[in-house]
Amino acid sequence: MLHTLRSLWVWFAVALLIVLWLPLLTAIRVTDRSPVRYRTGRWFRNLGVIMCRANPFWKIHLSGHTRVTDPRKPYVVISNHQSLADIPILSHLPWEMKWVAKKVLFRLPFVGWMMRLAGDIPVDRADPHSGGTMLLTAMRYLEGKCSVMFFPEGTRSPDSRVHRFADGAFHIAIKAQVPLLPVAIEGSYRCLPKRSWRFGEPSSVHVTVLPEVPTKGMTVDDVGRLKTTIRRMIIEEVARARHTTVDAVDGLSTVSPSAVSS
């Protein structure tokens, strides 16, 4: 009962923050002259950070290459995807990046409106033209020295393991000749379990920024190898943080999901 009441309280606080943040973000957008809406985007990510701080269930730990010397150096950022909580959690990273997200999210009241204000990138898998539009928008941001963020699994992991990566993000990085920045997130699947509105037990989430991987000189022929390299880096880091084996984290391995420790 106490756990349910705490979850209700956190959702109330989150809803209040979202409603209050919309007019603030609208005012910032009106005065933001940057073609990539950098300041608007950063203020939107700040909402995610505040939401995490308002939640007594979550403790966020950042490690790795988080100290960037140039926040305007463009990357294609790649992360595994364990939970809806990943979005506010990854907003702790100290640079602006535009998120590639399902088009349906942009239709949500308040949150979807703010995603549009911040300049995030919608993609509709049912529309064959949507991928091309997404690519052009992502390229424009990268040319404007703003990073772009992808969950290449395309959806939340059903079992907390790292599943198959799509090619799109890697094509974009090679086309733009910008480095890839792998990010491994571990523990968020406990924060907000799939198909549940209640927050999980108090959880520590570890976000590790791994070394960048250059794409200079690569061509489309390198997409498969590059994708395998990045996915392997993330799997190895998740396995290290979880104190388990690589096979237990790899969603394409023959190891049963039940072997994944919680």
Residues covered by each model-derived region:
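Catalytic core of membrane glycerolipid acyltransferases/transacylases, capturing the structured
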Residues: 25-42, 53-55, 70-128
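A generic structural signal for alpha->beta connector loops
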Residues: 57-59, 96, 117, 145, ...
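A generic structural signal for well-ordered alpha-helical segments
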Residues: 52-53, 115, 141, 173
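A secondary-structure boundary/capping signal
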Residues: 64, 79-80, 101-102, 151-153, ...
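Membrane-anchoring hydrophobic helices of lipid-metabolizing enzymes
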Residues: 1-75, 254, 259
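Non-catalytic C-terminal accessory region of glycerolipid acyltransferases
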Residues: 4-5, 132-262
